[in-house]
Amino acid sequence: MVTKYKIAADCVNAATRAVLEKCVAGAKIVDACAAGDASIERETGKYYNKKDKDGNKVEKGVAFPTCVSVNNCVCHNSPSAGDEKTFQDGDAVKIDLGAHVDGYVATCARTIVIGGQKVTGAQADVMKAAELASEIVIRKLRPGDSTAEIGATIESVAKDFGVSVVEGVVTHNMKRFIIDGNKVILNKSSPEMKADPEEIEMYEVYALDIVMSTGEG
């Protein structure tokens, strides 16, 4: 099982690199998405190709389609084939995608700015806040820790940087062939968005999903 998770992770890392190569000013966003999906299929296709005694192969491939979301589009933008939108210098671009091997899923997300210019001000603050919150959550994902306390930590980091956590975005546990499990870590609690506190358990797998904004969230 662990080996299959590692292979899936290697595949999403390769796919992310393929997407990044397409993220240049003037290039079509849809082409970047297509490059990610094609890379996942190509990379996962290198493994577990022998058939079992019943003639079946291990299932593998895209677990979450490549999404490329620009500027105020929060996430999960996967345009149709005919979409003509292109990247522009200075665009803030969020990439997210996922691959699986035998149902064991690995996901990946990256944020970049088109053009490679130095990022400053509020844009730098929000990107650093999301990165730091992710690093802290990884350290806090230990057996016995509370999902509610982890969520509160995310909000605390955002406050320190003067930015907002995007409401409605949650971190889910994952199981085989299940990308959105029942146990969640809320990035931001609200009257409309609540979850009972639960303990992190040994051998659980989580897909961190932390999104922050310079707006109200």
Regions found by a protein language model. Give the residues of each.
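Active-site neighborhoods and metal-handling regions in enzymes and metal-associated proteins
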Residues: 1-217
